[in-house]
Design a protein with these regions (language model features):
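Canonical tetratricopeptide repeat
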Residues: 53, 87, 121-122, 156, ...
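TPR-adjacent "capping" and linker segments in tetratricopeptide-repeat scaffold/adaptor proteins
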Residues: 2-16, 111-115, 320
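Alpha-helical segment of the N-proximal tetratricopeptide repeat
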Residues: 13-47, 56, 60, 125, ...
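Helix-start (N-cap) detector for alpha-helical repeat units in TPR-like alpha-solenoids
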Residues: 14, 48-49, 82-83, 115-118, ...
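Terminal, low-structured helical/coil segments at or just beyond the last alpha-helical repeat
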Residues: 3-6, 288-324
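Structural marker of alpha-solenoid helical repeat scaffolds
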Residues: 43, 77, 110-112, 145-146, ...
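Structural signature of tandem alpha-helical TPR/SEL1-like repeats
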Residues: 27-35, 61-73, 95-107, 128-142, ...
Length: 324
């Protein structure tokens, strides 16, 4: 067998080249990895698995049409390769083709680290985008290990629908969840958030109050209810609720920022500044906090501090706009 050592050397070289390409991908050098893999494919046309490697590189580069081209070849060559099938499905989804993604993602429901996302979640989103809401609910129920007809399944699906801006269906599903189990924690909070987002303030207030009846230790509900009250100029109620939210959770900046806004509206500028300074310490790069601080200082007649904060807010805003 005179060719055996040469074959072994060729395999070793191929393995080393693949390891090098993987390292380049980990470093984010996708074009270099793709170039090396294409050279490898040209010099080793008989080598298996290179279409999957190239498809993966294009997937990680977010070049989904090219990823689809190579992953289709990889799937055709080995129909039982779950990774190739799942990556092809994800590439279709991320390339804006959810209907093509669904049968592939249905076929492979496991987790593959190469994809770096939960394919079960993506499958649920594909169902939403193709308006197949019952199957979306079944997918999310499976993801969260709850029965598909449970209140929790309806609530999880409502949350995902809201995230995808399918607001009317989200409202319908959240209401269904509340009807199935009116005491399900966070279902009234979700409805309140939805109504607040739609500026349906009285309905939002009613839902947040229901949530507090069954879930009185939830800091976010006090915060969101305070937000609703502040929108109808009920600043005393808003301040009282914000204080409760902060007592329950002093790690969130939102309640401190809203407290600053509420106190400024009440004319309590020094207390407003104190709340906003606390928020700025926790998150120095939030332009809203610095803008509100600038306004509060201006109301107090502190011109230099006001200009400094407003200038900083503008700088942070422009930085965020240039790096979305």
């Amino acid at each position: 067998m005179p060719d055996a050592p040469a074959d072994q050397a060729s395999v070793s070289l191929l393995t080393a080249d693949l390891a090098s390409a993987h390292k380049l991908m980990q470093e984010g050098k996708f074009d270099q990895a793709i170039g090396d893999l294409q050279s490898l494919q040209a010099s080793h046309p008989e080598a298996k698995g290179l279409d999957l490697e190239l498809g993966t590189a294009y997937y990680k580069k977010s070049d989904f049409p090219k990823a689809i081209e190579y992953l289709k070849k990889a799937s055709a060559a080995d129909p039982n390769n779950g990774e190739a099938t799942q990556l092809l499905g994800l590439s279709y989804y991320l390339g804006g083709h959810p209907a093509e993604a669904i049968p592939l993602l249905e076929k492979v429901q496991g987790w593959y680290s190469r994809a770096n996302v939960d394919a079960a979640y993506i499958l649920g989103i594909c169902y939403i985008q193709t308006k197949d809401y019952p199957r979306a609910r079944a997918a999310f129920a499976r993801m969260f290990d709850v029965p598909p007809d449970s209140a929790a399944a309806y609530m999880f699906t409502a949350r995902m629908l809201l995230r995808q801006e399918f607001d009317p269906v989200a409202e319908e599903y959240a209401q269904k969840a509340a009807a199935v189990d009116p005491k399900l924690p966070l279902v009234h909070f979700l409805l309140g958030e939805l109504y607040l987002y739609k500026s349906r303030v009285p309905e939002a207030i009613a839902e947040f109050q229901k949530e507090l009846t069954i879930n009185p230790g939830h800091a976010q509900t006090y915060y969101k209810l305070a937000d609703a009250y502040s929108r109808i100029q009920k600043f005393e109620d808003a301040e009282r609720l914000l204080q409760r939210s902060i007592w329950l959770d002093a790690t969130s900046t939102g309640p401190y920022i809203l407290m600053g806004k509420v106190l400024e509206k009440k004319g309590e500028f020094e207390l407003a500044v104190r709340a906003l300074q606390r928020a700025a310490t926790m998150d120095p790069n939030n332009p809203t906090t610095h803008h509100l601080l600038g306004q509060a200082y201006r109301d107090m007649g502190k011109k230099e501090e006001a200009e400094s904060e407003l200038k900083l807010a503008e700088q942070l805003q422009s930085q965020q706009s240039s790096h979305p």
